[in-house]
Amino acid sequence: MEKKQISSLELLKLTTDKGDTSYGADQKWFFGPVKQRSGCGPATAAIIFYYIDRKKEPEKPPMAFRFFRIFLERMWGIVTPTRHGIPEARMLATRIKNYASLRHYHVDVKSMEIPENPSERPHISEVFRMLFEAMDNDVPAAFLNLENTSCPDLDTWHWVTVIGIDCDNAGFARVTFLDNGSVKYFDLAHWWTQGKGAGGIVTVIPKNDRRFW
């Protein structure tokens, strides 16, 4: 059995203007219905970068809700979806690199596409390795689910933020992720073998100490 996760979920705890607790961002926090419908990619990127910064000064209070919404808008300005969202891992990775470059921040950004056709996919061990690498570096990862409906908590055509993965020898691989302010789970092995398992992964590993926001 192998279990890896980020060191502190509490660093991603935010309080909304209504006093509700949220873990990570909710894409409904964007301004305007278009952004709220298609903001999962930039919201996921914002969560990853926010966590990296929070780790540097964990004793400080979390970002105020109104400022986090501004942070999301800034992220949208660079990690901008197309009219079809951000349906490929390489697209999100490119936008993240652009954001980091504009902020003069050096990061190692990796992406992996997971095609629907089994013959075109990477081996599932490569998927585990990529997620484990992110967790080993104590950074959340971005996971894209396209048309797979086999996992009830995982929306289709949607980016989520992976914060942990727990594998056993029986083939179970529980992924812990954040989506719209909640902690959720899905079985990666089940996702891989059932339905249309197309999607992708993006990881972001920082290489210096510059703040993101």
Predicted regions, residues:
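A sequence-level detector of short, solvent-exposed, charge-rich linear segments
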Residues: E59, M63-A64, S111, P115, ...
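Short alpha-helical interface elements
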Residues: A64-F65, R69, E73, R121, ...
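Predominantly the structural core of cysteine protease catalytic domains
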Residues: T82-C167
